[in-house]
């Protein structure tokens, strides 16, 4: 092997080692957002749920502030259960369809895909039923 080839091979290996430290990005959040739109028939933008109450959005703590926030806590708890089963819910892709009564998971899905799909479909339907209180969006009070 020529020295130039060895240098290229070394550079590729170093690049791959560096990339292994980059945390994976949530892949199924796009699917979950589409499920939310399916369930609420496009009446409320998905981003309205990203910083709502104590549990809608990144993280979560304290007591849910209302019914919608309880939907988010239940969804968080469902993802925790998925993790206990060895699933990676934020990285798990699945098949589903938008029916007249909201999102429906594909019957052919099994294991982690089915579990995570059920978490997301249940949450999306819960979001659609729960009242949206504008005063709970981007709340400033700490959740305890």
Curated annotation (Swiss-Prot):
Coiled coil: none annotated. The active site is at residues 75, 120. Residues 1-19 form the signal peptide. GO terms for cellular component: extracellular region. Its EC number is 3.1.1.4. InterPro entries: PLipase_A2, PLipase_A2_Asp_AS, PLipase_A2_dom, PLipase_A2_dom_sf, PLipase_A2_His_AS. SUPFAM superfamilies: Phospholipase A2, PLA2. Expressed by the venom gland. GO terms for molecular function: calcium ion binding; calcium-dependent phospholipase A2 activity; phospholipid binding; toxin activity. It is an enzyme of class 3 (hydrolase). Its cofactor is Ca(2+). It catalyses: a 1,2-diacyl-sn-glycero-3-phosphocholine + H2O = a 1-acyl-sn-glycero-3-phosphocholine + a fatty acid + H(+). Disulfide bonds join 38-98, 54-143, 56-72, 71-126, 78-119, 87-112, 105-117. Keywords: Calcium, Disulfide bond, Hemostasis impairing toxin, Hydrolase, Lipid degradation, Lipid metabolism, Metal-binding, Platelet aggregation inhibiting toxin, Secreted, Signal, Toxin. Binds 1 Ca(2+) ion. One of its GO terms (biological process) is arachidonate secretion. It is found in: Secreted. Residues 20-27 form a propeptide. Pfam families: Phospholip_A2_1. Snake venom phospholipase A2 (PLA2) that inhibits collagen-induced platelet aggregation. PLA2 catalyzes the calcium-dependent hydrolysis of the 2-acyl groups in 3-sn-phosphoglycerides. This is Acidic phospholipase A2 S15-109. It comes from Austrelaps superbus (Lowland copperhead snake). The lineage of its organism: Eukaryota, Metazoa, Chordata, Craniata, Vertebrata.
């Amino acid at each position: 092997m020529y020295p130039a080839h060895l240098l290229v091979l070394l550079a590729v290996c170093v690049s791959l080692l560096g990339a292994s430290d980059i945390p994976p990005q949530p892949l199924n959040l796009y699917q979950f957002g589409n499920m939310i739109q399916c369930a609420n028939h496009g009446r409320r933008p998905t981003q309205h749920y990203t910083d709502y109450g104590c549990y809608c959005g990144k993280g979560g703590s304290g007591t849910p502030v209302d019914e919608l926030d309880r939907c988010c806590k239940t969804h968080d708890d469902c993802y925790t259960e998925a993790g206990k089963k060895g699933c990676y819910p934020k990285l798990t892709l699945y098949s589903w369809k938008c029916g007249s009564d909201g999102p429906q998971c594909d019957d052919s899905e099994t294991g982690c895909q089915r579990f995570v799909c059920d978490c997301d479909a249940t949450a999306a339907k819960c979001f659609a039923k729960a009242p949206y209180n504008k005063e709970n969006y981007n709340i400033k009070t700490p959740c305890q």
